[in-house]
Amino acid sequence: KAILTGNHKTGTDRIFEAFQKLKTSDIEYVVNLQGDEPMIDPKDIINLNNLMIKNNSDIGTLASEVKEDSILNNENIVKVITKEKLENNKFTKALNFSRKNLSKQNSNIYHHIGIYAYKVSVLEKFINFNQTKNEIENRLEQLRALDNNITVMVALAKSSPIGIDTKEDYIAIKKIMEYKS
């Protein structure tokens, strides 16, 4: 079932409207899988959901190892800096998200994957905050959570899916999907 929404500044604001249209009260978590991540492994989504429930987390997301230094220098790719090294089936706290060029001096820099899981009560709180200067300048809505002292937890994805950040990415994904079908 598709749910149409009005215009919103961010995807998170959009999913909250869609969630409200469901008119349900028995859901604890909402998962926002961004449309530019069509190749994400379903097992990683299940792992994120399980970690959210197990840890009673407010917001969770996924990241993968940085396999190439070019990722660190690509402003189309979002990086996440974590408090601790990511390990399988564990959460660690996100310290920052960035599009900027980063050096690998900090070993806790990962390739962020466009998926978020929200506790419904936290999602409602999040969308009622104004967009922050940091969020607007960096074009990263997750910074609104960090700027308002909401903890974002990060889990390690087993694979690093190709996201669609550029026209070249779109062409590459299209070829992969055509091959698989």
Labelled PLM ranges:
Residues 12-15, 45, 94, 123, ...:
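A general structural signal for well-ordered alpha-helical segments in protein cores
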Residues 40-132:
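Conserved core of the sugar-phosphate nucleotidyltransferase
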Residues 1-33, 37-47:
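Short phosphate-binding loop-to-helix
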Residues 107-181:
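Conserved alpha/beta core of the MobA/IspD/sugar-nucleotide pyrophosphorylase nucleotidyltransferase superfamily
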Residues 24-27, 54-58, 150:
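Short, high-confidence coil segments that cap the C-terminus of an alpha-helix
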Residues 8-13, 67-68, 103, 161-163:
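A short acidic, often aromatic-flanked loop/helix-cap motif at beta-alpha or helix-coil junctions
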Residues 20-24, 53, 178:
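Residue-level signal for alpha-helix termini/capping positions
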Residues 1, 93, 151-153:
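Conserved beta-strand segments of alpha/beta enzyme cores
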